[in-house]
Swiss-Prot record:
<feature type="repeat" description="PPR 8">
    <location>
        <begin position="420"/>
        <end position="454"/>
    </location>
</feature>
<feature type="repeat" description="PPR 3">
    <location>
        <begin position="245"/>
        <end position="279"/>
    </location>
</feature>
<keyword id="KW-0677">Repeat</keyword>
<dbReference type="InterPro" id="IPR002885">
    <property type="entry name" value="Pentatricopeptide_rpt"/>
</dbReference>
<dbReference type="Pfam" id="PF01535">
    <property type="entry name" value="PPR"/>
</dbReference>
<dbReference type="Pfam" id="PF13041">
    <property type="entry name" value="PPR_2"/>
</dbReference>
<dbReference type="InterPro" id="IPR011990">
    <property type="entry name" value="TPR-like_helical_dom_sf"/>
</dbReference>
<feature type="repeat" description="PPR 6">
    <location>
        <begin position="350"/>
        <end position="384"/>
    </location>
</feature>
<feature type="repeat" description="PPR 4">
    <location>
        <begin position="280"/>
        <end position="314"/>
    </location>
</feature>
<feature type="repeat" description="PPR 2">
    <location>
        <begin position="210"/>
        <end position="244"/>
    </location>
</feature>
<comment type="similarity">
    <text>Belongs to the PPR family. P subfamily.</text>
</comment>
<feature type="repeat" description="PPR 1">
    <location>
        <begin position="179"/>
        <end position="209"/>
    </location>
</feature>
<feature type="repeat" description="PPR 7">
    <location>
        <begin position="385"/>
        <end position="419"/>
    </location>
</feature>
<feature type="repeat" description="PPR 5">
    <location>
        <begin position="315"/>
        <end position="349"/>
    </location>
</feature>
<protein>
    <recommendedName>
        <fullName>Putative pentatricopeptide repeat-containing protein At1g02420</fullName>
    </recommendedName>
</protein>
Length: 491
């Protein structure tokens, strides 16, 4: 065992230790994080995509490489691009290059991933062009899942009206499969990307054109903060003769727990058992979170034991919910004991687990232990997510630790984790504040080469910094590289 946090009286944070099995000591240089092998074809193609600025360059590289473009390879390349935030336009060229091969047909996974990449980068015209191309060559690839991917990106960046318009545009494109599953995809999108109120309003305006099923109501029940709204849909569902399943009950239990109506949640669990619907791990995890909201972390921990008695065993998410409760209560020793327990049961802490402790360290402004935790996270072969990166980069900025910030950035670039856009805003701000022109230029170039456009504020600051350092040729080179972005480059 080892101590990782000293007593922090100013923040009322108690001592706690972190298990050796959870956070075994390891040097960062020795950290073994899974990445693509150097000789892997997917990694080679990925580098071609991000290393080419022109369509002709990419085609020549692919043609001369001798790499056989199979469905599996293209799936892996597109997955790599998605999670590494690669160049969207060059990725589309790669996708079309493969489509043009005689006898080749993409997988539905490739299509949906390509559409996601385009949508994330606001390339909506290209999305509809690609869908039309796909309909002509292989209509079977377009599914309700495809529609949900597209609508999700539209809803994320546009209005509810534009999202519904895109829904009807899909109907005109592929009218033959337009049914309740598509209606459900629209509602799920609105619940996830807009608001429950928007989903409710669209449901009531369109429900007579479709036949709502159990999945429709399961979607509409999830996410409400008011139990009255959820109960109204529950009653409407029963009025249509639909029998609730475990998902239905879990959704309503979630509403009760978020509304701090824990007794209603327990009564509904009893009703589930009466109806011979067995509560699952999601049911218990929801209750654990609800007990934390009303300040009962000890009772929540007992739920972990209780669920085992019913033959349901906690997973990482269930443990994370209980750990979160103790972190909120500043009982970090108890939180760590749960980490110890989950590891002994063969469950590996994930990025969410680490983030619970990163949050505490961030509130305590404890730079040293945050860095130590990050090193050990990589050593335990757990890749940080965007939230982990933001906890760290903000702390590095507060302490003006350029070396740590640059190391985090290098790890992101090499290992492919985190959001370049979000992290770069903070990182470049730090580098500009400290007049670190070489480092700022390096980060900006790496970001552009990955296919990500820096924010206008960051670009203007770095451009000014480079001009003051008489790096005019480098500025021109940077502007040329940013030509891959269709939007105007700020002057």
């Amino acid at each position: 065992m080892m101590m990782i946090l000293k007593p922090l009286s100013s923040h009322h944070v108690s001592n706690f230790r972190l298990s050796v099995s959870f956070l075994h000591s390891v040097a960062l240089s020795d950290a073994k994080v899974p990445v693509e092998e150097e000789g892997d074809d997917a990694e080679t193609v990925f580098r071609m995509i991000n290393g080419s600025n022109l369509q002709v360059e990419l085609k020549e590289s692919l043609s001369s490489s001798g790499i056989h473009l199979s469905k599996d390879l293209i799936d892996r390349v597109l997955k790599r691009v998605r999670f590494s935030h690669g160049n969207p336009i060059q990725t589309l060229e790669f996708y079309r290059y493969a489509s043009a091969i005689r006898g080749f047909y993409h997988s539905s996974f490739s299509l949906d991933t390509m559409l996601y990449i385009l949508g994330r980068n606001r390339k909506f015209d290209q999305i509809w062009e690609l869908l039309i191309e796909t309909k002509r060559k292989d209509r079977s690839l377009i599914s309700p899942r495809t529609m949900q991917v597209v609508l999700g990106r539209v809803a994320k960046l546009c209005s509810v009206r534009q999202t519904v318009e895109s829904f009807w545009k899909f109907k005109r494109l592929v009218p033959d499969f337009f049914d309740t599953a598509c209606f459900n995809a629209l509602l799920r999108t609105l619940c996830q990307e807009k608001s429950m109120t928007d989903a409710r309003n669209v449901y009531h305006s369109l429900k007579h054109q479709f036949q709502p099923d159990l999945q429709t109501f399961n979607i509409l029940l999830s996410g409400w903060k008011s139990s009255e709204e959820a109960e109204a849909f529950f009653e409407e569902m029963k009025g249509k003769g639909l029998k609730p399943d475990v998902v239905t009950y879990n959704s309503l239990i979630d509403v009760y727990c978020k509304d701090r109506e824990i007794e209603k949640a327990y009564k509904l669990i009893d009703k589930m058992r009466e109806e011979e619907e067995t509560p699952d791990v999601i049911t218990y995890t929801t209750v654990i979170g609800g007990l934390g909201l009303i300040g009962q972390p000890d009772k929540a921990r007992e739920v972990l034991k209780e669920m085992k008695e019913y033959g349901c065993y906690p997973d990482v998410a269930a443990y994370n919910a209980a750990i979160r409760n103790f972190c909120i209560a500043r009982r970090l020793g108890d939180a760590d004991k749960l980490v110890d327990e989950m590891v002994k049961k063969g469950l590996s802490p994930n990025a969410t687990t680490y983030n619970l402790f990163f949050r505490v360290l961030s509130l305590a402004n404890d730079l040293g232990r945050s860095w130590e935790l990050y090193v050990r996270m990589l050593g335990n072969e757990c890749l940080p997510n965007t939230q982990s990166c933001m906890f760290l980069i903000k702390m590095f900025k507060r302490h003006e630790k350029v070396d740590m910030a640059m190391r985090l950035w290098e790890d992101m670039v090499v290992k492919g984790f985190g959001s370049y856009s979000l992290v770069s805003d903070v990182l470049l701000d730090l580098l500009c504040d400290l007049a670190k022109v070489e480092e700022a230029e390096k980060c900006l170039l790496e970001m552009v080469e990955k296919g990500h456009r820096p924010s206008n504020v960051s670009f203007k600051r770095i451009k000014l910094l480079m001009e003051l350092a008489n790096k005019h040729d480098e500025v021109n080179n940077l502007i040329q590289k940013m030509a891959i972005f269709s939007t105007e480059i700020p002057r």
